[in-house]
Structure formats: structure tokens, C-alpha cells
Design a protein with these regions (language model features):
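Helix-to-loop junction immediately C-terminal to a conserved catalytic motif
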Residues: 50
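Conserved ABC ATPase "signature" C-loop
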Residues: 212-213
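Conserved ABC transporter NBD signature motif
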Residues: 58-68, 76
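Conserved ABC ATPase signature
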Residues: 134-138, 142
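A short, flexible loop at the N-terminus of ABC-type nucleotide-binding domains that lies
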Residues: 1-3, 9-21, 33, 70-72, ...
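Conserved ABC ATPase "signature" region
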Residues: 112-130
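ABC ATPase C-loop
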Residues: 151-152
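The feature captures the beta-strand-to-loop junction immediately N-terminal to the Walker
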Residues: 35-37
Length: 277
């Protein structure tokens, strides 16, 4: 479990108080979307999960370890893998397999174990065929998958991803999201920063941040039912939710707390049947 208790963080040089009393519990195996306006503290928050940043007050514990204790920080970073928004900021190898091997090599694991982890990680994200490819020859989506594979080679309990589909075309975005869903189904906890509300709607839980605080916390259905509160802070809704709201505003008896396309289709077909009668 990742546990934050009244966490504050300030960027001293800029004088920006980025986190203001964050209390949050993230369970093992949970798939959580973190959303909110630009500058609300999302990236700052996830960097506390693996001790890249340390709170100026309050407490963060991961697997029972306090991130402020140096003796636990290596273990914490093995428990929580981080995938940055720009994969070029974390890819260090010349080839795909060299990069994925970098983390296990730093753990000073036996060569056979390193090779095993590399093969397994590449297979889990579906890029085994890229093993000997030069990093410079990869697409943006492929680099994102290499970054995820590099994290997986460390065998983390959680992966925190900062906008994993940013700047990707629809096909590459779909591929990355399928891999994320697959990893979650295998028991990996996923913390997923996104500005795409359709992506957020597919997770188990959404935490909305605003001005360094937790603004809302609940299931996708609970969060998007509070569309007035979301719009107050400039947030959009999933397209399907927007459609249902417009139908309701036009006088049709539809529910607006639906986020799944299949559930929306059931409602629309039901309405069509009533009009037909």
C-alpha cells in the first residue's frame, strides 16, 4: 500500500506550494487515474511515491517503508516504477535490450537473471522483436513501451505513469493503453496521470486534484456524475457523458452517471424502443 498522510511540498526556488495537505491511500493492485488542471500538483505527487521527491511535512509510506528514511529508499524505488511523460528522459541504453537491462544491472544481479528479466519484460509489453533495435530508430510509442519494459524489469509492485499517451497517435495510444490494462490484470498497481477523460473513465478509481489538494476521489461513475464541480475547475467530461447530459437537458429520461459506451447504448436503444412504440 502507498499511504500519504497530510503531505506538503514546496518548490523553494519558485516559491510554489505544490502539495497542500494531501492524504491518500492506494491499495495494491489498484488502477487509479490522477486528473486535474495543469499545475495542480499531479506530477509532483507521483514523484513522492518512489522517493524522487520527499515531503517537507507529512509522511509517505510505501509497503510500510517511510520515504524519508534513506535506508529504505532503494527498496521503495524497486516497489514503485516511474514512467515519465517524455521517455527520452529515462532511456539510457543504445539498444532496447541494453536499456531494459540497465535497472537490473544496477541491482548487481547475476547475468543470467538480468537476461531473463529483459526477455520477460519485453515479452510482457509485446516488443520482443525490438530487442536489438537502436533506440534512435524507434517511434514515440515504441519508446514509451521500452520505458515501461525498463520499469517492469525491476519487478515493481506499482507503476506510476505520467501521461503515457501524450503526443502519441491513436494507434500508438491504444497499444500503450492495452499494455497498461494487461499489466493491471496481472496484478500490477497502476497510477495513471491523464488529461484524457475517456482514459480515466476506464480505471477503477479517479482522484481529481486542484491547487495542490485532493478535490474529488471516487469511482469513474461517482466522479463524472459531479460534472458541475468538474467544470468549475475547467475539467472536461468523457464524450459519452457529455452526450448523455445533452440528451437529459433536451428532456429525455437518461442517466448521466454512465461512463461505459456499452451502458450508454443500452439506454439509447431503450429510448429508441419507447419512441418506436
Amino acid at each position: 500500500m502507498i499511504l500519504l498522510e497530510n503531505v506538503y511540498y514546496k518548490y523553494e526556488l519558485e516559491g510554489i506550494e505544490a502539495l497542500r495537505g494531501i492524504s491518500l491511500q492506494i491499495r495494491d493492485g489498484e488502477h487509479l487515474a490522477l486528473i486535474g488542471p495543469n499545475g495542480c500538483g499531479k506530477t509532483t505527487l507521483i514523484r513522492h511515491f518512489n522517493a524522487l521527491l520527499l515531503p517537507i511535512s507529512g509522511k509517505v509510506t510505501v509497503g510500510g517503508h517511510d520515504t524519508n528514511e534513506p535506508k529504505h529508499q532503494a527498496d521503495i524505488r524497486s516497489l514503485v516504477g516511474m514512467v515519465f511523460q517524455n521517455p527520452d528522459n529515462q532511456i539510457v541504453g543504445m539498444t532496447v535490450e541494453e536499456d531494459v537491462a540497465f535497472g537490473p544491472e544496477n541491482l548487481r544481479l547475476p547475468t543470467a537473471e538480468i537476461k531473463k528479466r529483459v526477455v520477460e519484460a519485453l515479452g510482457r509489453v509485446g516488443i520482443s522483436e525490438l530487442a536489438v533495435r537502436n533506440i534512435e530508430n524507434l517511434s514515440g510509442g515504441e519508446k514509451r513501451l521500452v520505458a515501461i519494459a525498463g520499469v517492469l524489469a525491476m519487478q515493481p509492485r506499482y507503476i506510476a505513469l505520467d501521461e503515457p499517451t501524450a503526443f502519441l497517435d491513436p494507434a500508438a495510444s491504444t497499444r500503450v493503453l492495452k499494455i497498461i490494462d494487461k499489466l493491471h490484470s496481472e496484478g500490477v498497481g497502476i497510477i495513471h496521470i491523464t488529461h484524457n477523460m475517456a482514459e480515466a473513465a476506464l480505471t477503477q478509481r479517479i482522484v481529481v486534484m486542484n491547487e495542490g489538494r485532493v478535490y474529488l476521489d471516487g469511482t469513474p461513475r461517482e466522479i463524472f456524475a459531479k460534472f458541475g464541480m468538474l467544470k468549475q475547475i475547467g475539467m472536461q467530461l468523457p464524450p459519452i457523458t457529455e452526450l448523455l447530459i445533452k440528451l437529459k437537458e433536451s428532456g429525455l429520461p437518461v442517466r448521466t452517471d454512465i461512463v461505459e459506451i456499452e451502458d450508454a447504448l443500452v439506454q439509447i436503444r431503450s429510448l429508441a424502443g419507447k419512441f418506436k412504440d
